[in-house]
């Protein structure tokens, strides 16, 4: 993949917004209280755009979304030591962190298709909600906050000016 930083696992992130310009976030099963946007690894031979569509479907059940924009460079974050040891055992590598291609997508149908336990992959999330951009950054784990801030700043011009305070629609699966 072009310009992929060495030592970083290739990954994609999805900033999914609804018609109110709120961002989809979900709380991780293995890190209670940590909210994040959908993301996941890019498989061998897979293009980042295809990986983003696949990850969104696998993690949320969402297939009704259109790609609006993408960040034109890889954004990176480093794993803290404890996380690095765990994920390197899990993934079988020596990664410093992740290099991510981010995509802005808009939900094009009803949120009723959101299903955190699609059966395609082991569930990663306990619950989900729509959040305003500031909340997305504040509720992320510390080491992802700078990346989330850059993603939100990059994509804000594409929002339609509807961003309102968080409308929590948490749903446990």
Where are these regions (language model features)?
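Acidic, metal-coordinating catalytic segment for phosphate/diphosphate chemistry
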Residues: 1-19, 92-93
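A short gly/proline-enriched turn/hairpin at secondary-structure junctions
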Residues: 36-39
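Unchanged
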Residues: 42-142, 173
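Charged phosphate-binding loop/patch that engages nucleotide di/tri-phosphates or the phosphate backbone
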Residues: 133-173
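Entry beta-strands of beta-propeller and related beta-repeat scaffolds
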Residues: 22-23
């Amino acid at each position: 993949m072009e310009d992929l930083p060495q030592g970083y696992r290739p990954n994609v992130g999805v900033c999914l917004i609804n018609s109110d310009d709120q961002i989809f976030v979900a709380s991780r099963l293995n890190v209670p209280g940590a909210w994040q946007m959908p993301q996941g690894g890019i498989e061998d031979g897979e293009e980042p755009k295809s990986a983003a569509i696949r990850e969104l479907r696998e993690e949320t059940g969402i297939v009704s979304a259109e790609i609006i924009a993408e960040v034109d460079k890889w954004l990176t974050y480093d794993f803290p030591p404890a996380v690095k040891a765990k994920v390197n055992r899990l993934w079988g590598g020596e990664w410093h962190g992740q290099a991510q291609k981010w995509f802005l997508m808009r939900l094009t149908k009803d949120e009723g298709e959101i299903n955190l336990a699609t059966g395609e992959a082991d569930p990663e999330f306990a619950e989900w909600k729509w959040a305003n951009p500031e909340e997305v950054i504040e509720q992320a784990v510390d080491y992802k906050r700078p990346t989330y801030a850059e993603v939100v700043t990059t994509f804000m011009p594409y929002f339609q000016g509807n961003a309102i305070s968080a409308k929590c629609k948490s749903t446990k699966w």
